């Protein structure tokens, strides 16, 4: 994962989301990255001392983590208190599970468990994501003809010279084949590199 903030998904209807929609969004926000700190402000500009201390503890431990500015979204700010049964901020989530607030984060930093638990969460999240991606790849392969070309673009509109050359070569064989446009699905694009152990 990157050190970018987690995406701040807004409802399409100007903030009037149902409880069910908010619940789904909270699940998404707490699991979109393995380590997420819900805080006032962001790591560059914390808006309270507790948020600053928690963010610094994660940064000082060398943890890759996302943040979500609860001041930017009142639905999340209020909804997460109920979701987590935790009334204050910041709140640290590891793989969708509440690890604790500022006091717990600082205790974990002091005894060394913050780094360990965050690293374990990252490892578990990455493994689960790889497994999900591999299942998607296997499903795509199972539904395709004997020949499947993962390419940039489509046979009629290849988006790179290499894809164009392979399409021309396949067309010359007269064999039927399917294609998958990797430019439309970055998860598959990156996952195929690992799945096939081939970087390009």
Report the location of each language-model feature.
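A short, hydrophobic beta-strand/beta-hairpin element that forms part of a small beta-sheet core
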Residues: 1, 88-104, 200
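N-terminal leader/targeting and pre-domain segments
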Residues: 1-36, 116-144, 148
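Eukaryotic short linear interaction motifs
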Residues: 44-47, 76-77, 107, 156-159, ...
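Thiol/disulfide oxidoreductase modules built on the thioredoxin-like
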Residues: 82-88, 194-199
């Amino acid at each position: 994962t990157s050190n970018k903030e987690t995406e701040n998904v807004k409802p399409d209807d100007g903030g009037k989301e149902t409880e069910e929609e908010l619940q789904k969004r909270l699940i998404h926000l707490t699991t979109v990255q393995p380590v997420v700190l819900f805080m006032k402000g962001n790591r560059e500009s914390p808006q309270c001392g507790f948020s600053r201390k928690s963010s610094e503890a994660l940064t000082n431990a060398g943890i890759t983590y996302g943040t979500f500015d609860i001041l930017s979204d009142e639905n999340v700010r209020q909804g997460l208190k109920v979701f987590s049964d935790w009334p204050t901020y910041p709140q640290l989530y590891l793989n969708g599970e509440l690890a604790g607030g500022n006091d717990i984060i600082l205790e974990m930093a002091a005894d060394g468990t913050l780094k360990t638990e965050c690293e374990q969460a990252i490892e578990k999240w990455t493994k689960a994501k790889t497994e999900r991606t591999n299942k998607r790849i296997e499903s795509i392969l199972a539904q395709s003809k004997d020949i499947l070309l993962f390419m940039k673009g489509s046979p009629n509109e290849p988006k790179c010279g290499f894809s164009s050359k392979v399409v021309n070569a396949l067309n010359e064989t007269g064999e039927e084949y399917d294609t998958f446009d990797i430019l439309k699905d970055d998860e598959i694009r990156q996952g195929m590199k690992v799945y096939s152990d081939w970087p390009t």
